[in-house]
Amino acid sequence: MPFEFIDAAHAGQAGSDPLQDELALLDLAAQGRQVAQLWEAPLSLVVPRTYLRHAALETARADFAQQGCPVFLRMSGGGLVPQGPGILNLSLAYTVEQPPGARSDAVYLHLCEVIGDALQSLGVDTHWQAVAGSFCDGRYNLAWGPPEAARKIAGTAQYWRRAPAAMQTADGQRHLVLAHAVLLVSAGPVQINARANAFEAAIDSGRHYDAGKVVSVREALLASGRAVDDDAALMAQVSDALRRSVGQTPPPA
């Protein structure tokens, strides 16, 4: 069964929580649907709920919101993620017949394959690996460049929920999974890292990110000597490539 693309109801609306549409995808997966969504968020930051342990979090959130950069809380783990112009999100929601411990790697690898194939069709070769110094670093980053000097181009995350009783299997192991990736298309690494570092400093987390550890699709294309369209055209080109790749890559069972 191919993925069904769902429009994001509030994508790009200033002040709206971009994660609400994403969580709604799990409700569709609970109906047995296999759904996908491409979306852009307004200028903002997204942090996991584990950041609630920082005493200065709510004060920093209020300060950043006043500056036009709201900070949203998400259900999945990991670290801080910048959002805004030039950044494209891909969310996939579907059912899995086994628990997270058995299939989380497969879910990550599927997401990396979808994005990697899309980027390869545009002339950008990537692979998955950790990139120390990048925001929200993880084992299943999608990275560009040789392994010893790789730069993060996309980050991935996932959130699991047990399937409702109406669609549960006899062994009780059916789950709903929301797999999410954030892809830097034309966003400037210096600008997004400065914003991320300012927030980490405001909550005194001790974290600091290196702009040289991330790269955009635009930068990767230019580095390979390819002509690059304007930002809007490049975003459309990347979106089309992702749609094709999602349609050609079935998820893990």
Curated annotation (Swiss-Prot):
One Pfam family in the UniProt entry: LplA-B_cat
Source organism, top-level taxon: Bacteria
Domain named BPL/LPL catalytic: residues: 30-236
Cystine pairings recorded for this chain: none
Record-linked Gene3D superfamilies: Bira Bifunctional Protein, Domain 2
Record-linked SUPFAM superfamilies: Class II aaRS and biotin synthetases
Gene Ontology annotations of biological process type: protein modification process
Protein name according to UniProt: Uncharacterized protein H16_B0148
